[in-house]
Amino acid sequence: MLNYVIKRLLGLIPTLFIVSVLVFLFVHMLPGDPARLIAGPEADAQVIELVRQQLGLDQPLYHQFWHYISNAVQGDFGLSMVSRRPVADEIASRFMPTLWLTITSMVWAVIFGMAAGIIAAVWRNRWPDRLSMTIAVSGISFPAFALGMLLIQVFSVELGWLPTVGADSWQHYILSSLTLGAAVAAVMARFTRASFVDVLSEDYMRTARAKGVSETWVVLKHGLRNAMIPVVTMMGLQFGFLLGGSIVVEKVFNWPGLGRLLVDSVEMRDYPVIQAEILLFSLEFILINLVVDVLYAAINPAIRYK
């Protein structure tokens, strides 16, 4: 197992290098001139050229790439073109709000999604199954931005129960986490149901029932563990999606997180911030997939990596 983890970690190096090259090329292909955006609409050509020199955009592209890669290897992603603060500080100040929003959304989505999936599988083709899957399909189909605006209109504007924007208190997490986790809970419910339906028909489940084990214990002890492998895979993918893909929700709720920072950086063509954020998202996905693979062995001892 240790050798497998080490090999996967070493595999990060070429993957992140390829991502770095692609991201660098992508941001420099974006339309628009960062120097013109930063200088302002009334700046003349001389001022814009001065800003370009200050940002290093007047240098050849290969020189900019070498400067970017050599500094990134040392953990230095440069200064933000807009705020002139270190990129690491910009990301660090936005990381925790996104992380807590992701964890909050994931916790309720996993609990609700797995419960709905188990209920649907146990009472297959009956009204609990149909009700759970109808709710799940609705959760997948309803766009996140529309759900967020609906929740704000009902619970903030009409009823006045919850705040609309910001991340200052636990109350701010309620509507935003519900919006962000709705699709995840729906996907989790469908995956859990599909996995449980297959497990419930296995021989060891019938053997446990024949021995007089209660149905609840059969489902929770024998069924849940064996049905968890595909569910854990989906949990890992969805966690990575939430951590890096909460852009729409953060924009709707004016959330001070990484998603909103990325949108603002793209609008202002802030190359260093865009490059660092996408590298961070790539690293998150790779590490989450590694954790999921390691969890396989903990859930099912028959799985071993040699």
Curated annotation (Swiss-Prot):
GO terms for cellular component: plasma membrane. It is found in: Cell inner membrane. Belongs to the binding-protein-dependent transport system permease family. The chain crosses the membrane at residues 9-29, 103-123, 135-155, 169-189, 229-249, 278-298. The keyword Coiled coil does not apply. Keywords: Cell inner membrane, Cell membrane, Membrane, Transmembrane, Transmembrane helix, Transport. Part of the ABC transporter complex GsiABCD involved in glutathione import. Probably responsible for the translocation of the substrate across the membrane. It is a multi-pass membrane protein. Residues 95-292 form the ABC transmembrane type-1 domain. Residues 30-102, 156-168, 250-277 are periplasmic. The keyword Membrane applies. NCBIfam families: PRK15081.1 (NF011661). It holds the Pfam family BPD_transp_1_N. SUPFAM superfamilies: MetI-like. This is Glutathione transport system permease protein GsiC. InterPro entries: BPD_transp_1_N, MetI-like, MetI-like_sf. CDD domains: TM_PBP2 (cd06261). Signal peptide: none annotated. Its main location: membrane.
